[in-house]
Amino acid sequence: MVAEKETLSLNKCPDKMPKRTKLLAQQPLPVHQPHSLVSEGFTVKAMMKNSVVRGPPAAGAFKERPTKPTAFRKFYERGDFPIALEHDSKGNKIAWKVEIEKLDYHHYLPLFFDGLCEMTFPYEFFARQGIHDMLEHGGNKILPVLPQLIIPIKNALNLRNRQVICVTLKVLQHLVVSAEMVGKALVPYYRQILPVLNIFKNMNGSYSLPRLECSGAIMARCNLDHLGSSDPPTSASQVAEIIVNSGDGIDYSQQKRENIGDLIQETLEAFERYGGENAFINIKYVVPTYESCLLN
């Protein structure tokens, strides 16, 4: 009877009835994630379940190399070069204290080529302008010195600096037309000079080049657009500007922007024209994508 009275009282007062608890959705138990272990490829750790294999490092083919002190700078600071900076109404140029034809090319020309690695004023200006002056007046003295120029040229190209590469290519274009047989004498050294050109051959970026002074006779034989009437020297750090996917026909003030891919193509064509019958096959061996400008 007492139980019946309690049920009747609960029915009359539903608020007093005990509330049912709602069942929540069952949550999945947390799963412990193992700590990932970074490992090198082809090692014992790489076979573990929680290992993450690190990818291969970048090859760095286009990465610039650090510069080293050059012999040209040491000789210039010591005052061993018979040159001085001359100022006139047109700009700055080299004033030679002796006749260029009387210089010892075996001593001076390799030193000036060593200065191709320089990128600061006045070293870069004296080195590049001095090279073109000596090539213009060298004549028969250039060919015997050619083996001594290969290592400085190779060192300049191996810096992978776009500005230095462009200027070195212009120097090579001038070198092959500076005297007879120089182009043919360069053929055995293609394997030392051309590998870097093969890397940058398809690069399409424009770089500013300082204009230098060169005679019209030399300009008529090779594409040296950056050579002109004496202009103020400009250091590489001041003129280095990249314009991707733009041509080389833009001329701002006295600085000529050159496309590095086009410069390499022009240089290889100059090598083939002046290198004789064996030039093309040796170029093709190092630069497989090069197509002959004479056979086609």
UniProtKB/Swiss-Prot annotation:
A Gene Ontology molecular function term of the record: G protein-coupled receptor binding
Transmembrane domains' residue ranges: none
Major location (coarse): cytoplasm
Keyword Cytoplasm: yes
Its biological purpose: Microtubule inner protein (MIP) part of the dynein-decorated doublet microtubules (DMTs) in cilia axoneme, which is required for motile cilia beating. Suppresses cell death induced by accumulation of unfolded Pael receptor (Pael-R, a substrate of Parkin). Facilitates the formation of inclusions consisting of Pael-R, molecular chaperones, protein degradation molecules and itself when proteasome is inhibited. May play an important role in the formation of Lewy bodies and protection of dopaminergic neurons against Parkinson disease.
Note: Linked to PRKN in a head-to-head arrangement on opposite DNA strands and share a common 5'-flanking promoter region.
Protein name, as recorded: Parkin coregulated gene protein
Annotated organism of origin: Homo sapiens (Human)
